Each structure stands twice: as C-alpha cells, then as structure tokens.
C-alpha cells in the first residue's frame, strides 16, 4: 500500500508519514523506510509515546536504536529522488489489515505501531530485545482506547477521555490524598439512596459556598474504598469531571461535543462501574454552545440522565441553581435535590479535630484543641459573610502558616545580638586601621582604650551568640525531626489501611506492631527531648497554634480587636473618659455612657446579638455631639476619620432610603450597593454617626429598626450586613429650646429632661425610641466650658505656627476677650471658632505675609482697649521688638 491518500489515515498518522520524508532526507536515504516513520512518530509527544510508556518501554532507548540503524544505511547525495521502500509498503498493508480487524475507518498511530512490531527490517529485532510482543502492546492499546472506534480523523482526543478530563476520586482516596470527611453521614446516606434508584439516579448537592458540598463527594469516594456502601455502589469509580479542561483548546466547531461524547461513551460502556461527579454543575448550561446552535453540554447529558444510563452527582450553590438549573425545567427534573446545610459550631469543631493531623503535618506545628474551638466560635460570630466549616478551616490554616513562618526565621533576640556583633567588628577594623596611622600620644591612647573596650564586649557577646545559635539550631532540628516522623507515621497508617482493605492481614500486623510502634516510640522520645531542651534554657521557637493566634487572624481579617488586652490598652479603656474629655468639654453624662459601652464590649460583656451601643444625642447646636463621635473614633482607631458618617439631611425624600442600603434591582446603581451597608461590610468595627436625624424622612428610620435591635440589615442584593461590632450614634437638635431655657436652673433638670424626651416622642416612633440604648442630653455651654474649648482651638493655631517655627502665647486678657466675643448660648462653640478666625487668625495671616514676624519669633497676643495686639518677644517674655495692633 502506497502512502498517497491522506483520507485513509488519521491526521496524526498522516502527519507522521509526511514528517518521515524529512527524516529520510536528514539521513540521506534514497528509500522511505519503516525506521523513518517510527522516528517521526516517536519524536512527537503523542499516542505513540504513551503506548510505549504504558508498556514499560523506554521511548528514548527505542528512538536512539532507530536513529543508529538509520545512520548505518546507504547514503545518497542530497537532493536525490525519494522512493517508498518495500518495508514501508508492507507496514502500511499490515496496518490496514489491523484497521479492518478492529472495524475502524482510518489507519491510526496505534495500527502503525502494532504493525511495526512485526516489521522484518528492524521492528522484530528491536521488540525481541525489549522482550515485548504484539499481544502486550495490543493489551495496552485496548486499555487506552477502551470501547472507542476510529470513526474520524482525530480519534486520539477521545482515547482515555475520562483520564484526560477527569480526576478519579476513588483512586485519590485509596492513596490517602483526600482529607477525612467528618460527620455528614445523613447527607452521604441521602446521596447513596438517590444513586441507588433505577432511573433519574442523579443527586444534586445544593448549598451555600463553603458548607462542604465537594467534601460529601470525597466522603462517598472514601466509603466506596472502605466498602461501606450498598452492593449497587461497591467497587465503583467516582470520577470528578473537569469541564474547564473539556472546553479548553476546543477551537473548531464540534471539538467540545466530540470530547464530551467520548467521556459519556466511556461512562456508559463501563456498565454502571463509573459514577460521574460534576462540581459547579451550573457550568454545563451553555458550556460549548455557540451563536448558531443551542446545543450545549446540558442538552447532551439530558437523554442519558433520564434513561439512567449515566449516574451523575452534581454540586452547585443555591443562587446558581436558581439562576441556571431551575430555568431549564427538563434538566432540573432529571436531578434530585439534596440540600447541604451549614454545620453547627459543635459539628465544625468535630470537623476541625478530624483535619487537625493533616494541618499539623503540613505546617510542622501543633494545633491546640482550644485553637480549634476558638476558630469555630470566632468565625461563626465575627465573619458573617462566609460559611462554616470553610471559614473556620481557613482560620486554622492561616494561623498555622503564620506560626510556621515565624519558626523558619531567626528569633529577634538572636538577630539583634548578631547585628550588634557585626557593628562592633566593623568598628574594631576601623580602629585597627587608625592605630597604624602616625598619631600623637593622646589620640593614640584613646584609640587603644576604645579598641580594648570593643574587644572586651566582643569577647563577652560572642560566646552568648554561639550558645544561642546552637540552642536555636538544636530546637529547630528537633522540630523538623518530629515533623518527619509524623509524616512517616501517616504513611505507615495509610499502608495499614490499604493492607486491611486487600485482606493482607499479615502485612497489616507487621506494620502495625512493628514499624508503627517503633515510629511512635521514636516520636515520643524526640518530643520528650524537645521539652527537656526547652525547659533547660527556655524556648526560642513556639510550635503551638493557640487561641490567641486564631483571635489575631480574625482581628486582621475583620478589623475587630479580639486579641487579649495589653496592659497599655487596658489602662486606656479604664481612663477612656479622660481621653474623650481632652476633646469634648463638659457633657459628662454622654462621655460616661459611651465609655461604659466600649468597656463592656472589650471586656466580653456585651449582648452578642446587638450593636456595642446605640445612642441618641439631643441638645442645641455646637455643644459637641458630632465632636464626641469623632473623639470616640480617634480613641478607638487612632484616627478620627475612621468614622462612618451619614448626613441625614441628604435623606429628606422617602425614596432616598435606597441610597442607604442600595438601589433595588432594575434601577441605576443596583451593583454599587448602599452608602451605609458597603461601608460596614468593609469595616465591621466602626463608629457610625447619623448626623441631624430629625432632618431625614420618617420612613428612613424603619431601615434602622433591625440594625438597632438585631445588629444586622439586609441590603438590596440580599446580603446580610453585620452591625454587631459598631457603635451607633444619632444626633438631633429636637427640644434644644427647652435645654437653653432651663439649663441655668439645676433644680429644674428633670423637668427639662422630660420636655426634651416629649419632643423626641412626638417626632420619632415608639418602636424606634424603644430600641435605642440611651437618650443623652447635651447641655448648653457656659463661659467656663467655652474658655477650655478656646484653649483647644488655640492649640490648633499654635500647631500651624509651629510648622513655620513661630511660637504663640496669649495673655489671660486676650483669652477672655476671645471667649467674650465668641460666647453665644444659642449657637454653642461654633461662634467661638469664628471669633478666633476673625480676631486672631486673619490679622496674623496679614502680619506673616508682611514678614513682620519671622521664623524663631515668639508672638505675644495681648488686649489693649478692645483690640488684640501682637508683638514679638524673646522666649522668656522680655526683649519686645515691636507691637502691632490687630487693626
């Protein structure tokens, strides 16, 4: 048979024949022979190499022998005519015969390779040397091809399709590569029940992201391996299909369908031996479809799913199931829903205990049980936008990774000692060079004295550094040895399980009572050695993940301070009133109420289902309501801008409430989220200020009812936003006229309070007021408070001048004048700010521009008549340079 008709060959086989001509020319051969075709075939990565490798044949060795043989053949001048050799003719005839035997439509690579085994020119000798015959190679080809026939010119993509596009979960379970699945017995039993049906035996696992849907499929694989399943599932293979690999590289129309059909063909021809698992099931809807055709993966699956020819487990989230699967009623009815709920905190703790060994071995650390309990409880309480057990597992994983990173780096104490030694060594070298210079007696003696002191310090520090280094190294080596023993112990346990599954009880007993016991004794001895070393000289390396490590990770994720209180912070919380009073003058009731709420929260005494505190500040304008919120933000976060401020005057219309929680679906801005909800999602631990609440439309307060009572709100996209770690402050000017009228008379304080509360009750609904922790009255400011506020305001001016290296001092008369000009009981402290700006800042700005005062001056501000005067004085207050009036 002459190689002249490409339509009789598959694409890859014809490609090998075409390339063989280049090989023949490379070896200056006159005839195209079998060795040239085989060299071309084996140089390319493909089915030829796979068949040889699966038959335990070294491809490189075969290729080298073929090339050596080709070099020994007669050579002709370059450019000579190339003819088809008799051996190639015979090879193609034999390949064609094999094709007919297999009922294939095209000559493929495997036909050429099997025909080459009987090649009299070189093939027979080569395979005899390898001790391999055609039957062995044919068995390998059959294992790769399965039930597939060569029906088109690109059949290689369909061979071992499941191996290419799937992952065998049962094999992974047999090798111990899957994490143990703890609990979930009811859900796994329900999946087995659906799989055991005659038709529509396809469960779909539906649940929120991170609740363990994929883990249930892995748990089923482990049960199949252990034989803990009904007869209908015993010895079955559970294969996870990777749709991404199926679609990737499918350039031409029909490629994807061919690949999927090959997978389904393998599954159906396994006669129920294969159960398919499709993670992210919603991706089958629309996968592989194009503009001109609605044929996608789901439409190829439907007939087989309905007839029960294909047993398939799907997994998807609730949202994606509703969005994709429910819309296709024909696909939905072929699957039986199995709802996977979020496990409880107790179940999560059990899951973490089951996974503990895997994470300890991976990170080379120990994880305490209290850390596992803390991970489950803290993640449930503080990480509200994710689900158990996923978020708890992530916490443990990250805390262990952080500790491992600390173990692999040098201790800070040792590093500091090494830095000091390097510094001393450099100084010693410098002084040695200086000593050799021609110096007078006094400097030379000083250099020698300094050199002597440095050498004495080096002699003192070096042994300490060496001892510390040796101890750290010994501790590190012991930890590494412990981890190595644990890994080996894990492997031995896996081998014992495998031997027990295979009923090789003799091997299982040898491992269990021989190697395993030896390893456990060695592990105990090494751990005792480590404890002894740590007890003798203290520990450098902390190898245990504790509750505090978990709390630190949660704090980093959420911004909520959960770590144990440091002494400095403890003191700060006890003195929070004094800290707040540095900025807020007077208003003791308000400051005390806010400080008490913060202390309750940090001491762990707050109601876990409500915000830290919710307050309604009522009082006249300019008395410090907004300032207290800013001062609190600065006290908690060291930044007064860490304040979520919502100006309620922007919510005067009824529809403006959508800006707070997000626009409803179909409206512009739906994807942007709400001003309030997005701010708290990003920063769950915050001070939230609703300024001037009475300016908002009454309907807006309905949104806040759930926030105040349950500490949560649902935004326009259905996400629950957690307000349990926020301080909510609302300010209002309602009833301020009663405060101003009766503030001077202390005996009528209760009457004033009742009148203000009546004003609030007239405006706010009872269900709103009833949810607030405390309604706090802010008093009007007197001259004494205003004088203190003036000093705070003047410190700001002093700071601005200090940047220009100019100092500012005011006489008591000047200060009294500013307070008198700025005093207005109706408007509070704001007129004082304007008075300071008008009387002090404006004239000063002019003098600075005129260069009357220069850097280094101290400006004394005094009152002469009814005007402020400015003059430069020496720091001691004498040596006047000039006096300048404000006018």
UniProtKB/Swiss-Prot annotation:
Region NBD1: list its residue ranges: 160-342
Q: Which residues form a coiled coil?
A: 393-535
Segments forming domain Clp R: 6-147
Residues the record lists as binding ATP 1 = 207-214
Region feature C-terminal, mapped onto this chain: 781-887
Location of region: Repeat 1: 9-73
Domain description from the entry? The Clp repeat (R) domain probably functions as a substrate-discriminating domain, recruiting aggregated proteins to the ClpB hexamer and/or stabilizing bound proteins. The NBD2 domain is responsible for oligomerization, whereas the NBD1 domain stabilizes the hexamer probably in an ATP-dependent manner. The movement of the coiled-coil domain is essential for ClpB ability to rescue proteins from an aggregated state, probably by pulling apart large aggregated proteins, which are bound between the coiled-coils motifs of adjacent ClpB subunits in the functional hexamer.
Q: Write the protein's name.
A: Chaperone protein ClpB 2
**Which source organism?**
Thermosynechococcus vestitus (strain NIES-2133 / IAM M-273 / BP-1)
Q: What is the lineage of its organism?
A: Bacteria, Bacillati, Cyanobacteriota, Cyanophyceae, Acaryochloridales
